[in-house]
Protein backbone atom coordinates (compact mmCIF):
# COMPACT_ATOMS: atom_id res chain seq x y z
CA UNK A 1 0.00 0.00 0.00
CA UNK A 2 1.46 3.34 -1.03
CA UNK A 3 0.30 6.39 0.91
CA UNK A 4 0.32 9.17 -1.64
CA UNK A 5 0.89 11.91 0.84
CA UNK A 6 3.93 13.69 -0.54
CA UNK A 7 7.06 13.67 1.60
CA UNK A 8 9.39 16.36 0.32
CA UNK A 9 13.06 15.46 0.30
CA UNK A 10 14.95 18.67 0.90
CA UNK A 11 18.35 20.07 1.56
CA UNK A 12 18.71 21.29 5.12
CA UNK A 13 20.78 24.45 5.25
CA UNK A 14 22.57 25.11 8.52
CA UNK A 15 24.30 28.33 7.55
CA UNK A 16 24.00 30.99 4.88
CA UNK A 17 26.62 29.19 2.81
CA UNK A 18 24.40 28.25 -0.12
CA UNK A 19 23.22 31.10 -2.29
CA UNK A 20 22.67 30.79 -6.01
CA UNK A 21 25.46 32.44 -8.03
CA UNK A 22 26.95 33.94 -4.85
CA UNK A 23 30.61 33.69 -3.92
CA UNK A 24 31.11 31.18 -1.10
CA UNK A 25 34.45 32.58 0.06
CA UNK A 26 34.47 32.99 3.82
CA UNK A 27 30.93 31.65 4.22
CA UNK A 28 31.64 28.02 5.06
CA UNK A 29 32.64 26.45 8.36
CA UNK A 30 36.18 25.89 7.12
CA UNK A 31 37.67 28.33 4.65
CA UNK A 32 38.03 26.76 1.23
CA UNK A 33 36.15 23.62 2.24
CA UNK A 34 32.48 22.71 1.83
CA UNK A 35 31.30 20.41 4.64
CA UNK A 36 28.26 18.34 3.74
CA UNK A 37 26.38 16.03 6.10
CA UNK A 38 24.59 12.80 5.34
CA UNK A 39 23.01 10.06 7.42
CA UNK A 40 24.72 7.32 9.37
CA UNK A 41 24.27 5.10 7.48
CA UNK A 42 23.27 6.75 4.21
CA UNK A 43 20.90 4.51 2.31
CA UNK A 44 20.58 3.48 -1.33
CA UNK A 45 19.38 4.99 -3.68
CA UNK A 46 20.32 8.30 -2.02
CA UNK A 47 23.94 7.25 -1.48
CA UNK A 48 25.43 4.11 -2.99
CA UNK A 49 27.28 1.71 -0.67
CA UNK A 50 27.14 4.27 2.18
CA UNK A 51 29.99 6.15 0.46
CA UNK A 52 28.95 9.72 -0.43
CA UNK A 53 32.47 10.63 -1.56
CA UNK A 54 31.95 8.26 -4.51
CA UNK A 55 29.40 10.73 -5.96
CA UNK A 56 27.19 7.71 -6.63
CA UNK A 57 23.54 7.91 -5.61
CA UNK A 58 20.97 10.66 -6.01
CA UNK A 59 21.88 12.81 -3.01
CA UNK A 60 25.62 12.28 -3.39
CA UNK A 61 25.38 13.44 -7.00
CA UNK A 62 23.23 16.44 -6.04
CA UNK A 63 25.74 17.41 -3.35
CA UNK A 64 28.67 17.51 -5.77
CA UNK A 65 26.60 19.36 -8.36
CA UNK A 66 25.76 22.03 -5.77
CA UNK A 67 29.41 22.18 -4.71
CA UNK A 68 30.48 22.76 -8.31
CA UNK A 69 27.97 25.58 -8.71
CA UNK A 70 29.44 27.17 -5.58
CA UNK A 71 32.96 26.92 -6.98
CA UNK A 72 34.24 23.98 -4.92
CA UNK A 73 36.27 21.26 -6.60
CA UNK A 74 35.52 17.66 -5.64
CA UNK A 75 38.61 17.50 -3.42
CA UNK A 76 37.38 20.55 -1.48
CA UNK A 77 34.26 18.68 -0.34
CA UNK A 78 34.33 16.87 2.99
CA UNK A 79 31.61 14.69 4.48
CA UNK A 80 30.38 14.29 8.05
CA UNK A 81 27.69 12.04 9.50
CA UNK A 82 24.72 13.09 11.59
CA UNK A 83 21.61 11.45 12.89
CA UNK A 84 18.29 12.76 11.67
CA UNK A 85 17.56 14.13 15.15
CA UNK A 86 20.87 16.01 15.38
CA UNK A 87 20.21 17.68 12.04
CA UNK A 88 16.91 19.31 12.96
CA UNK A 89 17.63 20.27 16.57
CA UNK A 90 18.54 23.84 17.59
CA UNK A 91 22.18 24.70 18.11
CA UNK A 92 25.50 24.84 16.33
CA UNK A 93 26.07 22.40 13.48
CA UNK A 94 29.20 20.73 12.15
CA UNK A 95 28.14 21.04 8.50
CA UNK A 96 27.39 23.68 5.89
CA UNK A 97 24.37 21.80 4.61
CA UNK A 98 22.77 18.41 5.08
CA UNK A 99 21.00 16.09 2.65
CA UNK A 100 18.84 13.42 4.30
CA UNK A 101 15.37 13.34 2.73
CA UNK A 102 13.98 15.88 5.14
CA UNK A 103 10.27 16.59 5.11
CA UNK A 104 9.45 20.28 5.46
CA UNK A 105 7.12 21.11 8.34
CA UNK A 106 6.23 24.47 9.91
CA UNK A 107 7.72 23.32 13.22
CA UNK A 108 11.05 22.46 11.64
CA UNK A 109 11.15 25.70 9.67
CA UNK A 110 11.20 27.55 12.99
CA UNK A 111 14.52 25.88 13.81
CA UNK A 112 16.40 25.36 10.54
CA UNK A 113 16.34 26.69 6.99
CA UNK A 114 15.32 24.50 4.06
CA UNK A 115 16.04 24.72 0.38
CA UNK A 116 13.31 24.20 -2.17
CA UNK A 117 12.41 20.50 -2.40
CA UNK A 118 14.57 18.54 -4.81
CA UNK A 119 12.55 15.32 -4.68
CA UNK A 120 9.07 14.19 -3.68
CA UNK A 121 8.07 10.62 -2.97
CA UNK A 122 5.15 8.49 -1.94
CA UNK A 123 5.30 6.72 1.39
CA UNK A 124 5.21 2.92 1.53
CA UNK A 125 4.49 0.30 4.17
CA UNK A 126 7.52 -1.87 4.91
CA UNK A 127 6.76 -5.20 6.52
CA UNK A 128 7.85 -8.84 6.22
CA UNK A 129 6.47 -11.74 4.25
CA UNK A 130 5.64 -13.46 7.55
CA UNK A 131 3.28 -10.62 8.50
CA UNK A 132 1.58 -10.85 5.10
CA UNK A 133 1.31 -14.63 5.43
CA UNK A 134 -0.38 -14.08 8.79
CA UNK A 135 -3.14 -12.17 7.01
CA UNK A 136 -2.05 -8.53 6.81
CA UNK A 137 -3.69 -6.75 3.88
CA UNK A 138 -3.31 -3.38 2.17
CA UNK A 139 -6.42 -1.92 3.77
CA UNK A 140 -6.73 0.64 6.54
CA UNK A 141 -8.72 -1.81 8.69
CA UNK A 142 -5.95 -4.37 8.43
CA UNK A 143 -3.15 -1.84 8.92
CA UNK A 144 -4.77 -0.63 12.14
CA UNK A 145 -4.22 -4.02 13.75
CA UNK A 146 -0.47 -4.15 13.11
CA UNK A 147 2.26 -3.26 15.59
CA UNK A 148 4.00 -0.22 14.10
CA UNK A 149 7.42 1.26 14.67
CA UNK A 150 8.75 4.67 13.69
CA UNK A 151 11.68 7.02 14.11
CA UNK A 152 10.39 9.41 16.75
CA UNK A 153 11.88 12.39 14.92
CA UNK A 154 10.29 11.85 11.51
CA UNK A 155 6.95 12.75 9.96
CA UNK A 156 6.11 9.02 9.89
CA UNK A 157 4.68 9.39 13.40
CA UNK A 158 1.97 11.98 12.62
CA UNK A 159 1.27 10.26 9.29
CA UNK A 160 0.65 6.99 11.09
CA UNK A 161 -1.61 8.60 13.64
CA UNK A 162 -3.54 10.69 11.12
CA UNK A 163 -3.86 8.30 8.18
CA UNK A 164 -3.91 4.87 9.82
CA UNK A 165 -4.66 5.46 13.53
CA UNK A 166 -3.29 2.11 14.73
CA UNK A 167 -5.07 0.27 17.52
CA UNK A 168 -1.80 0.36 19.49
CA UNK A 169 0.45 3.41 19.74
CA UNK A 170 3.52 3.07 17.49
CA UNK A 171 6.75 2.04 19.19
CA UNK A 172 9.20 4.91 18.82
CA UNK A 173 12.91 4.58 18.12
CA UNK A 174 15.92 6.88 17.88
CA UNK A 175 16.50 6.36 14.16
CA UNK A 176 15.54 4.21 11.20
CA UNK A 177 18.38 1.78 11.89
CA UNK A 178 16.67 0.93 15.17
CA UNK A 179 13.31 0.65 13.40
CA UNK A 180 14.58 -1.94 10.93
CA UNK A 181 16.39 -3.80 13.73
CA UNK A 182 13.09 -3.98 15.63
CA UNK A 183 11.39 -5.39 12.55
CA UNK A 184 14.09 -8.03 12.15
CA UNK A 185 13.64 -8.93 15.83
CA UNK A 186 9.87 -9.20 15.24
CA UNK A 187 9.16 -6.50 17.81
CA UNK A 188 7.13 -4.60 15.21
CA UNK A 189 5.13 -5.63 12.16
CA UNK A 190 5.45 -2.60 9.92
CA UNK A 191 6.91 0.88 9.41
CA UNK A 192 6.48 3.78 7.00
CA UNK A 193 9.34 4.88 4.75
CA UNK A 194 9.64 6.88 1.57
CA UNK A 195 9.15 4.51 -1.35
CA UNK A 196 12.77 4.36 -2.64
CA UNK A 197 14.10 3.65 0.86
CA UNK A 198 11.38 1.08 1.53
CA UNK A 199 12.26 -0.77 -1.68
CA UNK A 200 15.93 -0.89 -0.68
CA UNK A 201 15.23 -1.99 2.90
CA UNK A 202 12.89 -4.75 1.77
CA UNK A 203 15.43 -6.09 -0.72
CA UNK A 204 18.68 -5.72 1.21
CA UNK A 205 18.31 -4.96 4.93
CA UNK A 206 15.20 -6.74 6.26
CA UNK A 207 15.23 -10.51 5.65
CA UNK A 208 12.08 -11.51 3.74
CA UNK A 209 11.10 -7.86 3.65
CA UNK A 210 8.06 -6.87 1.64
CA UNK A 211 5.96 -3.85 0.76
CA UNK A 212 2.28 -4.00 1.63
Residue positions per predicted region:
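Extracytoplasmic small-molecule ligand-binding "clamshell" domains
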Residues: 22-101, 110
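Short Pro/Gly-enriched coil loops immediately N-terminal to beta-strands
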Residues: 113-127, 163
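Ligand-binding cleft/hinge of the Venus flytrap
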Residues: 49-52, 63-75, 140-142, 155-174, ...
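Flexible hinge/capping segments at coil-to-helix
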Residues: 129-147
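Alpha-to-beta junction loops
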Residues: 72-74, 92-100, 146, 184-197, ...
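A ligand-binding cleft/hinge motif common to bilobed small-molecule-binding domains
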Residues: 85-86, 102-111, 161-162, 189-212
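Short helix-initiation/N-cap motifs at beta->coil->alpha
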Residues: 77-89, 134-136, 171-185
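N-terminal signal peptide c-region/cleavage motif recognized by signal peptidases
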Residues: 14-19
Amino acid sequence: MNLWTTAAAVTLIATSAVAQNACATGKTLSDGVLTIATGNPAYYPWVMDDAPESKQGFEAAVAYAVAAEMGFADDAVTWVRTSFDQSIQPGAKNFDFNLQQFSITPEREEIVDFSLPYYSSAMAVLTTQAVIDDGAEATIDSLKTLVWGADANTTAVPMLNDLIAPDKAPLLYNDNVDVTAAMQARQIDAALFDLPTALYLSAVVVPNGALL
